[in-house]
Structures are given as C-alpha cells and as structure tokens.
Regions:
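Substrate/ligand-engaging "lid" and interaction regions
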Residues: 178
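Glycine-rich phosphate/dinucleotide-binding loop and adjoining beta-alpha-beta core of small-molecule
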Residues: 182
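Pseudouridine synthase
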Residues: 175
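Hydrophobic alpha-helical transmembrane segments
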Residues: 1-172, 185-309
Length: 309
C-alpha cells in the first residue's frame, strides 16, 4: 500500500464512521472508562489537605497513562500486517470524534421543544451542565446552540488538531483532558481546588483549537468581516476559549449568547456575547448545523493534507 494512502485512510475511515454512526449506545466507549477512572480518583482523593496538588497529580497521571498506553499499543502493532495499525488508528479516530452525536442531540432539543417546554428542558439537560429546570423556550434554544458551537471545538476540531500534532496517542490524550475538565474542572466548592489543574490543562490544550474553530466557522460562511465580531466578543466568557466559537456562531446568526446561568445550584454571572436578543428558531439551528459540518469538512481536509505532506 502506498504510504500516502496509508497516511490518509485512518482519518477517512474514522471520520466516515462518525458521520454514519455517531456514538452508538450499544458500543463501549473509552470516554466512559475515562469517566469511571476520574470519578474513582476524585472520590478517593478529593478530601482533606493538599487537594490542589492531588488533583494536579491525578490529571497529569491519567493524561500521561492514556498517551503512553496508546503509544505502546501502536508500537506493538508496527511489526504486524499494516492493516492492523490502520484499523487501530481508525477506531481511535472514530471514538474521539463527536460531531454527529452532538448534532443529533441538538436537533432532538428543538424537536422536544416543539412538543413541550418541559421536554425541551429535559433534552437540553443531556448536553449542558447548567440548571435547565426553569429555562424559557428561548433559553433552551440558546443553550443548545451555544453547546453546538463550543463542542464543535471540543468534539471535532480540537481532537483533529491534536491528531495532526501528536497522532492518535495525542488525540486520545486530548479526550482525557477534555473529560477531566467536563467532570471536575468547575469553580464550585467541591471542585475548585481539586479540579483547577484539570481546567488549566484543558485551557492550554484548547487555546489554539478554539480560535481555529471560530476561524473555520467564519470561513464556512465566506463572510470574513465577521472575524472582527469574533475577536471583540470572544473574550466575553468565563472560559478563555469557549467564547470564540460561541461568538462565531452568534455573529453568523446575528443573535445573543451568554448571560447568567446556574451551575450546581450556584449563579454564575457570565457576560453576553453579542447584542441582538432576538428569537431563535429551528431555521437558526439548521443553519448552525450546516456551519458545523462545513467547518468540520475543512478541518478534515487540512489534516489529510498535513498527513501526506
């Protein structure tokens, strides 16, 4: 098999599998195992003194273990028939991409909201960390679209970025970074010490991908003038990264994101992204999905070119 074909096939196979299947509930997923490992460490170590140091130790060790284990497995496969390594990498890529599942979940939020506000609240609670019990219909739509933008970075662009930089071990290690942040990277009383290093590492790992995501979203619309809106409003977020893809989508849809939210019973007064507080519709969701898919295709092409050059 020509080397350039071998270089691009794992990504093509893994990406196409994600497009076709998403994350089937019947298929075991590494992120579930990551979550169990994080939960076990947090339960055992997030108590007493030195919580910040213990949290840093847990984050660094788990990330390093995932990288080392996947690197070692690839080394074991090198002397064997080449298709085995190709399949291994393709499966890792498939597991690390979450674009299709995210889009399905956001569509389900809008469908549920058409049935009732309560169903919409319950559905959006599956994909956001905030308290959804008292959200209005507009706030449910806003939360879903914010998550669609933010997780284009976390679930697609950032994994592909780290694939291009460090191969499948780096891609899988990034998923551990992201899972750590999603589970313990909160500024609540329980997690603010133990999870602070998980949050810092996630901020570093997503610094370039988040901004790249915003750029790709704007490129997907062909209206580069909106970049000024992104750079102005991307900083209006508690996260140093999440605001950029959210600002890109707010600029594309000419709407307003952000604002105060409840997380784990605590009110977080987040700034607004954008100024046009207009009614969001299913048409906006469909447009956002098209933007996500186009940005994803551009990124896949860039990584494919990187792999053969």
């Amino acid at each position: 098999m020509d080397s350039w074909i071998f270089a691009i096939l794992p990504l093509l196979i893994g990406w196409l599998l994600d497009l076709l299947l998403g994350d089937p509930i019947w298929l075991p997923h590494p992120v579930v195992w990551f979550g169990k490992a994080i939960a076990a460490c947090e339960h055992k170590l997030n108590r007493g003194n030195f919580r910040k140091a213990k949290g840093a130790f847990v984050a660094i060790v788990l990330i390093a273990l995932v990288f080392a284990l996947s690197w070692f497995l690839r080394r074991l496969l090198l002397p064997l028939p080449s298709y085995l390594l190709l399949l291994f990498d393709a499966i890792i890529i498939f597991y690390c991409l979450a674009g299709t599942t995210l889009i399905r979940e956001v569509r389900e939020v809008f469908l549920a909201l058409d049935r009732s506000l309560d169903e919409g609240r319950q559905q959006v609670a599956r994909i956001v960390g905030r308290d959804t019990s008292e959200l209005s219909a507009q706030e449910v739509r806003t939360a879903a679209l914010e998550t669609l933008a933010e997780n284009l970075s976390d679930g697609v662009i950032a994994p592909l970025f780290w694939l291009a930089i460090l191969g499948t071990p780096g891609m899988l290690a990034y998923k551990m970074v992201n899972t750590l942040d999603s589970m313990i990277g909160y500024k609540t009383e329980r997690y603010k010490a133990f999870g602070c290093w998980a949050a810092h590492i996630d901020d570093i790992a997503n610094y370039i991908p988040a901004r790249l995501t915003a750029l790709l979203m704007i490129l997907a619309t062909g209206k580069l003038g909106r970049l000024r809106f992104v750079w102005k409003n991307g900083r209006n977020h508690a996260s140093p990264n999440s605001g950029y893809p959210e600002a890109a989508l707010a600029g594309i849809l000419n709407c307003r994101f952000g604002g105060p939210h409840y997380y784990f019973g605590q009110l977080f007064d987040k700034p607004y992204i954008g100024e046009n507080d207009r009614l969001l519709t299913t048409a906006d969701m469909k447009k956002a999905v098209r933007v996500n898919r186009t940005a994803e295709v551009i990124m896949v092409i860039l990584v494919l070119l990187r792999s053969i050059l």
